[in-house]
UniProtKB/Swiss-Prot annotation:
UniProt keyword terms in alphabetical order: Activator, Nucleus, Transcription, Transcription regulation
A Pfam cross-reference name: Med31
Protein name: Mediator of RNA polymerase II transcription subunit 31
Record's keyword annotation contains Nucleus: yes
Subunit structure, interactors included: Component of the Mediator complex.
Amino acid sequence: METKWLLSKVPDDKSRFEIELEFVQMLSNPWYLNFLAQHKYFEDEAFLQYLEYMEYWREPEYVKFIIYPTCLHMLTLLKNPQFRNDISRADLSKQVNDEIYYEWLGKGLQQYGSADDATLSQPQQEEDEKKVDVKKENE
């Protein structure tokens, strides 16, 4: 798979910055990761090197532009070969998507561990949904 197109057609530094910012933030979408896994991008060494290159977004001078900080967590998870393989499953993509949703609701994202231990715990969806319903009733 040829991935040189990722950087080869970028005309200037401003455009490159915008393209790379958009790309790194797309990593916060589990369904996009599912697409990449199903289309074997994570088997391409050049693409994996590009993901490693994206680590510069953690630097203070760049992180301030990140709107979806979950993307940096996903970038960490993508270092784990098991996670890269597992995210191709629709059930896992849905689980990760649900956990992100509950994080946005203020319920807290399940802890995945380090890049070496990127296992996913089952979200407490039914319990969380009941809590959300009770909260709505009390408002």
